[in-house]
């Protein structure tokens, strides 16, 4: 799968852009704050129906403007597909595939698989369990629609149970139906997470070793209440209800799962250097790519946002070697250092294109495909 063309109007600092992409390597060069990451965020939005920054839709509309639109043209398994997004603050979001509006946006997740490697991935190591659960859920949801359905059902039931706890409800019958729903979905969620961690572990270790190549031993494991308690979630909820009534929320369940990250038998957050942490998160994302490629039976888009920061020259060289391989499909790379991008393009025999990014405008610098077409003309920012 690859994104052939992208049209953007009023997305963050991008007033107007019309870009035609290489099916392999696309590089974006520019200083910080110029719009490189915003371009990747637009591509991410078309796959996930939301920004990777966590901003609300209304905050994505360019300052001073009243709407935003995006249109992406894809080659998906040899079939032309088009996605369209329209946002008008205060109105319902429009998200169309092939001109048809989605009834449920959750039905879109996984249809256009994508893996993002970004500076915020540091939170996978240093952040809370919520960050690592989000990572698990995003990956598995793209490959298993039923998993996403169970996440939604569990989340709704969890909110209902928490409301009963806050209202100091004491009638056991009020909890029964809710907790039965939670248990059914929790069993599926936990099983899917366990299987995913087991499959990811070996792939992740191989990528880490290829980048680090210094004998470091990484490992990951799922930390789950249900894995440690075979009696099921309802038994756990019953045993903790008195405590939950006091604190006003549910203290056990998949919403409290975590991933333990280890390096040489020590927690990564305590023992690893910045370079080791960066290597760790990149290896996790590349393992995610392999997992999704096999599950979806197509190559996801790979977005690499400022990935070379905090890596020494040797690890940069090894990473460039990895992402230049044919196992990866279409790649979007941003950097402030032209040498990094030139090195990637020189190492790859594949088609490539590169742009200079300044204040939300994109100027084609180089293309292995020859002369630019109309889509590649620099887009001028409107004047007041």
Can you say where each PLM-predicted feature lies in the sequence?
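Conserved lysine of the Walker
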Residues: 36
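Conserved NTPase motor "head" modules and their coupling/switch loops across ABC/AAA+ ATPases, GTPases
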Residues: 1-31, 45, 173-184, 188-303, ...
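Short, flexible loop segments at the rims of nucleotide/cofactor-binding pockets, characterized by
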Residues: 94, 308-310
């Amino acid at each position: 799968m690859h994104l052939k063309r992208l049209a953007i109007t009023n997305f963050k600092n991008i007033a107007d852009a019309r870009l035609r992409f290489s099916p392999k390597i696309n590089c974006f060069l520019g200083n910080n704050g110029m719009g490189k990451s915003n371009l990747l965020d637009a591509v991410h939005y078309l796959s996930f129906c939301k920004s990777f920054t966590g901003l609300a839709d209304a905050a994505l509309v360019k300052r001073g403007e009243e709407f935003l639109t995006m249109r992406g043209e894809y080659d998906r398994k040899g079939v032309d597909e088009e996605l369209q997004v329209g946002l008008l603050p205060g109105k319902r979001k429009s998200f169309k595939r092939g001109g048809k509006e989605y009834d449920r946006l959750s039905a879109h997740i996984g249809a256009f698989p994508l893996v993002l490697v970004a500076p915020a991935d540091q939170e996978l190591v240093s952040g809370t369990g919520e960050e690592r659960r989000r990572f698990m859920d995003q990956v598995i949801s793209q490959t298993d629609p039923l998993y996403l359905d169970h996440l939604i059902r569990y989340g709704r039931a969890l909110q209902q149970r928490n409301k009963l706890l806050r209202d100091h409800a004491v009638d056991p019958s009020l909890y029964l139906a809710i907790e039965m729903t939670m248990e059914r979905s929790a069993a599926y969620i936990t099983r899917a997470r366990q299987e995913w961690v087991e499959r990811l572990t070996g792939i992740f270790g191989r990528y880490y070793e290829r980048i680090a190549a210094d004998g470091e031993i990484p490992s990951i494991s799922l930390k789950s209440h249900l894995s440690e308690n075979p009696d099921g979630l309802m038994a756990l909820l019953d045993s903790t209800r008195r405590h939950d009534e006091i604190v006003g929320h549910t203290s056990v369940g998949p919403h409290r799962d975590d991933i333990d990250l280890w390096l040489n038998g020590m927690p990564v957050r305590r023992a690893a250097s910045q370079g080791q942490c960066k290597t760790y998160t990149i290896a996790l994302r590349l393992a995610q790519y392999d997992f999704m490629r096999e599950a979806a039976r197509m190559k996801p888009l790979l977005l690499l946002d400022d990935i070379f920061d905090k890596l020494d020259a040797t690890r940069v060289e090894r990473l460039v070697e990895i992402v230049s391989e044919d196992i990866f499909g279409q790649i979007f790379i941003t950097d402030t250092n032209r040498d990094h991008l030139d090195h990637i393009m020189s190492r790859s025999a594949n088609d490539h294109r590169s742009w200079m990014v300044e204040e939300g405008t994109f100027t084609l610098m180089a293309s292995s495909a020859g002369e630019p077409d109309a889509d590649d003309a620099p887009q001028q920012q409107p004047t007041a």
